[in-house]
Amino acid sequence: MKYCKLQDLCTDIIDCPHSTPEWKNSGIRVVRNFNLKNGNLDFTDGYFVDEETYLNRIKRAVPEAYDIIISREAPMGVVAIIPENLKCCLGQRLVLLKVDKNKVNPVYLLYVLMSDFVQTQFRRADATGSIVSNLCIPDLKNIIIPVIEENQDDVSKLLASINDKVLLNYKINDNLAA
């Protein structure tokens, strides 16, 4: 195993636009903090923008399949991976990781970002003293990531399979509670 800074495993780390777009009833999805759940995107509560707003919000980077989104605050350090065939842009307080697939499997990185090892680093990086926790980009870039050099794909598949079972259990519990 080796240890790398997050910035060394990404081709880019992009902060989202710091503005609230004008919402539409339909159109292109906007990922917001509350859409990030257990490494996945949950669009139970959906927000949309029109094409013009979308094009404005993706000027820094276009979110693509297997990019990872991290919340910078409220709550801080929650992550999700972008699935295939999702056209979206980011809302406020989010960061887009363009994962270098030649260096790390994006699914492996997603689960490492969810680990206690990394989440503890996120909490330690928040030294603002503010009531609202905040993860700033320079601190995020320097987060240390443990990288196994062999079997990343196998580990990623196993963790994704376990996560799928957990999500299924949540759905079953929701149906039983209804």
What are these regions (language model features)?
Residues M1-L41, T53-I58:
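Low-complexity, Lys/Gly-biased intrinsically disordered segments
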Residues G46-V49:
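Short glycine-enriched, charge-decorated loop/helix-capping segments at active-site entrances
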Residues M1-D15, N142-A178:
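Non-catalytic DNA-recognition/assembly elements of restriction-modification systems
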Residues L36, A74-M76, A127-T128:
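Short glycine-enriched loops at secondary-structure junctions
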Residues V107-D139:
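Short, positively charged
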Residues C88-V95, A127-S156, A160:
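A short glycine-rich beta-alpha junction/loop motif
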Residues R32, E51-M114, C136:
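A short beta-sheet element
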